[in-house]
């Protein structure tokens, strides 16, 4: 996002910098307590301290997971590009099932998911909330996925980095691992304060792995390739989860305003349609009716840098980041309109 980090995070960083010693960091008790308290207060999810494995980034966690779990990998497209590259980097086969889009509403295609799973599939990569389609998966959908994982004996790696960015007031984030003891046993949950509090450059994330055997496999896969977590990232994480509630509420209200303004503008252009964004600050825009060979290049030529849907497994779509000031958004919308009308 284009917003400054919360003042409490900046204060925590300044205090840590004033300390003056920047050796390797090791998580401290009050940091762990802030994570545990945050997960329980926000999501009703009570975890044990030993379940936490600290990471320098969430994408690192995706790649470690693919190394830690033997067998083929299953995911659903469109999806955040590292979901598609991590299995390849780990020498794992990747099976894809397309999500279904009905009247602009994205949902799971249970038949496609089952057909894409093979006897060799052992890992399911779940994006929750979903990047880029903006869904906050509800309890029924998650329980269906948990049943699917149990029936097919799958480990579920749930990327929940956008869990603090649910925009719809009637929606709430439900951690996959909180559904049941079986869901917890077969889960690796990846989280970070980076998206919600705009601190991705500080390099701090974590995995929550309740099962001891699975956790040991994950730790073994990290050996020798995953560095220590940035000590400044750890300090920022503690402050973000402990001291930034008011800032977070203001952020959500502002993002809702951006989303609603964006939806009106995009859906008002001929040949463009935007899916409703329940969570994240990312809009998923269908421009297939414009008939462009390369939509991202077309809009870039009109001064608007958008993520190419082809990278997510969905050519003809574009992703727009609306985590910005209203003035920047209005400028972007003007350029989007020019691009649409230039076809």
Model-assigned labels for residue ranges:
Residues 101-170:
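Active-site phosphate-binding strand-loop segment of PLP-dependent enzymes
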Residues 238, 247, 253-263, 273-286:
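Conserved glycine-rich beta-strand-loop-beta hairpin in the small C-terminal domain of fold type I
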Residues 1-57, 242-243, 342-343:
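N-terminal small-domain helix-loop-helix segment of the aminotransferase-like
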Residues 67-87:
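Conserved PLP-anchoring active-site segment centered on the Schiff-base-forming lysine
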Residues 90, 151-152, 183, 269, ...:
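Helix C-cap/helix->beta junction micro-motif
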Residues 180-256, 334:
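Conserved core segment of the aminotransferase class I/II
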Residues 114-115, 183, 294-307, 312-343:
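PLP-dependent enzyme catalytic core of the Aspartate aminotransferase-like
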């Amino acid at each position: 996002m284009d917003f400054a980090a919360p003042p409490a995070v900046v204060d925590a960083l300044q205090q840590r910098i004033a300390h003056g010693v920047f050796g390797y960091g090791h998580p401290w008790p009050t940091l762990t307590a802030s994570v545990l308290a945050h997960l329980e207060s926000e999501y009703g999810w009570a975890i044990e301290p030993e379940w936490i494995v600290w990471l320098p980034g969430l994408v690192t966690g995706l790649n470690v997971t693919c190394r830690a779990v033997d067998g083929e990998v299953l995911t659903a497209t469109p999806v955040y590009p590292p979901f598609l590259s991590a299995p390849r980097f780990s020498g794992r086969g990747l099976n894809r099932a397309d999500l279904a889009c009905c009247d602009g509403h994205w949902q799971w295609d249970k038949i496609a998911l089952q057909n894409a799973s093979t006897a060799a599939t052992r890992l399911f990569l779940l994006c929750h909330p979903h990047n880029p389609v903006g869904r906050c998966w509800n309890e029924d959908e998650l329980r269906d996925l948990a049943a699917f994982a149990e029936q097919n004996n799958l480990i579920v790696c749930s990327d929940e980095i956008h869990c603090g960015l649910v925009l719809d007031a009637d929606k709430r984030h439900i951690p996959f691992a909180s559904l049941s003891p079986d869901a917890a046993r077969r889960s690796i949950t990846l989280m970070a304060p980076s998206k919600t509090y705009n601190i991705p450059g500080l390099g701090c994330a974590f995995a929550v792995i309740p099962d001891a055997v699975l956790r040991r496999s994950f730790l073994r896969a990290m050996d020798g390739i995953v560095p220590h977590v940035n000590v400044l990232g750890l300090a920022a994480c503690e402050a973000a989860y402990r001291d930034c509630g008011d800032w977070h509420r203001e952020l959500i209200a502002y993002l809702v305003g951006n989303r609603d303004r964006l939806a009106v503008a995009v859906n008002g252009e001929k040949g463009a349609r935007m899916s409703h964004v329940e969570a994240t600050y990312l809009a998923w825009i269908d421009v297939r009716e414009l008939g462009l060979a390369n939509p991202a290049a077309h809009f870039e030529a009109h001064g608007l840098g958008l993520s190419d849907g082809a990278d997510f497994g969905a050519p003809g779509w574009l992703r727009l980041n609306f985590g910005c000031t209203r003035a920047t958004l209005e400028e972007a919308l003007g350029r989007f309109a020019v691009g649409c009308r230039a076809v």
